């Protein structure tokens, strides 16, 4: 199978870190293969970095399994370039997972090596593998091991189970196996839906060359089959653990929930149809969702758009005649969902959202019995006064009200968010214009505004940059931008927004205009007063700025103004002075359960004490147990991680550290695996584990400084009770 005789090589580097400017490769792996899964050759070598051994922390050795001492006698990159030149040429296709990272090190340390193109298995996986825990290669491979088609490839490529991830040659093998699996998926989809071959033939996608597909004339108009939308049954709690008569409670009043278990409280409140449950963060929302699902309530609403595709827009899109690489990826994703019976597209790239924005149907509001929201999500609903106005609001975590509301009021504004939205609209209206449905003049006006906004971002960035020229600070407080001579050019452009408003209102829909203009008005409001400016880094040399109002300090009365003409009760699980929402239960199971949880929580601030506690952990009693070490300070987490490695605890436990051993998705996936684990992370990561139903055998509070430490501890007991094994 295949078109021209391309040479396929999988490439992987192990490096001293993730910093593209300062880190170096310490191992290279190359494997040449063909599209039939045959291994044609390969190369692997350790590489000696310039960094001294003392600079290479033990964490590098832990993650890569390489001995730092081994690197001392390894060759430098320039010493092996002649050995690897044979793999590269004008017909070479380089395959890899997140290949741009490896490509950077290839071009920097092995300059001049030629290639035809690169193919990223990370991006291809986002197109063809749906809803994984993470798109980390290790997680994807674990997920695919149960599939017969992948098992066959694994045997062909001689992937040894005893080899490990973070070995360059082994990871190159895995990239090749993942690529071949994904190519086979595309082949299967083309066989099942021949129209995909027609689309590829009309495209710019390099997949067209791999599959040797030639452009063919369509015999008739194409009408894509609809996705199979699965709607959960409409269920509602008829009776809960406690009878709550809302007529007996005062609107806008705060109530304590005492020692009632979270699940019992949810079951009691869920009896009231048309309710919004609002929580201080998404992890708590996910915990509530899981408990409600356990209670049989699955038709839950969320504060986000219901995904629907317009049948007519989809048909026009399918018949437009030529497709970009991004559009082909979207069509592949669509047919992959169709084949698997998935009704909601797993949108996970900017290009996905651009195309979806152009194809989505006008939203029809669904009548959900219960809607789950974060505090911030609820605040955005309340600003749209007509939305869900008949719903009863239960505002959980009212003790976090002060922080969540003030953060919402002073929420930062990222101009790139607005620019991305304008680019989505440009794609939509460019598509509509190509159908002849609107005058090209309207598209031209939209592009003109987008270009003006792009210039505005550049001028504002240049004038902001001056304040950060002679300081290492990444956050500054500035006087109002409006009328500020230091922002002369910015102010000249700010005046022009008013001229664009009526024009923009005419060329896009009312909903789209509201979305854009609300962002513009939020920006202008920020610029009217003293503001915080934060410098965010793309990498070591590129940066951008986000802007926010100075932190607001709102009173309870100001907070309640947002809820005017709404029905709302505010619930606290910490304030014992408040009247109780529910009378104390006759038994005290919850107290016993809480005490059980508290018996497994240790407050230890010294590394030696933590190591001693871990050594005393009974692995026989908890063979799949997890010790969670709560640490909110990144450097202290790193130091503790190194101490665990030096103590050899990585031999007895799986070590997971937030933002060191992987992103949250990868670490959450590993936390569910068999065997004993030590997990180091912050409060938010702990709540994510609770939301994923990961049992915590022991909780060590290592460092938890700050004004909210009592609230955090209370949250752990409240939301983690079910998970403290």
Regions found by a protein language model. Name each.
Residues 2-3, 176-241:
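Acidic two-metal-ion nuclease catalytic site recognized across multiple nuclease folds
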Residues 2-116, 130, 134, 138-150:
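Conserved non-catalytic scaffold segment of RNase H-like nuclease domains
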Residues 242, 353-364, 379-385, 487-597:
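A contiguous, basic/glycine-rich beta-loop/short-helix subdomain that forms a polymer-engagement track
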Residues 279-371, 431, 437-447, 459-465, ...:
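A substrate-engagement module of RecA-like helicase motors
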Residues 290, 355-369, 374-492, 575-584, ...:
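Signature of the SF2 helicase/ATPase Hel1-core->accessory helical subdomain module
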